[in-house]
Amino acid sequence: MAIKLKIKKGDTVKIIAGDDKGKTGEVLAVLPKEKKVIVKDCKVAKKTVKPDQEKNPEGGFVNKEMPIDISNVAKVEGE
């Protein structure tokens, strides 16, 4: 069963641990079953994309935000 989280989509949070410590950003998605959040422009990874006739005929790399554990973020109050 998923727990109730105090951080919601659209909230501003600060990263308090990890490689992006000190950065602030907006929550794009909350994953309550995994206890993780996705924060805009934080923990960005390069993903390889295969060539596709419709979406991306050339293929290449795409920057994608990866989930961060809920314990590594703190909600910024007053914004």
UniProtKB/Swiss-Prot annotation:
Gene3D superfamilies xrefs: 2.30.30.30
Acetylation listed as a keyword: no
Keyword terms, alphabetized: Ribonucleoprotein, Ribosomal protein, RNA-binding, rRNA-binding
Cellular component GO terms, alphabetical: ribonucleoprotein complex; ribosome
GO molecular function: rRNA binding; structural constituent of ribosome
Source taxon at top rank: Bacteria
Annotated GO biological process: translation
Entries under SMART domains matching the protein: KOW
Subunit note: Part of the 50S ribosomal subunit.
Function summary: One of two assembly initiator proteins, it binds directly to the 5'-end of the 23S rRNA, where it nucleates assembly of the 50S subunit.
Family classification: Belongs to the universal ribosomal protein uL24 family.
Official protein name in the record: Large ribosomal subunit protein uL24
The organism of origin for this protein: Aliarcobacter butzleri (strain RM4018)
Gene: rplX
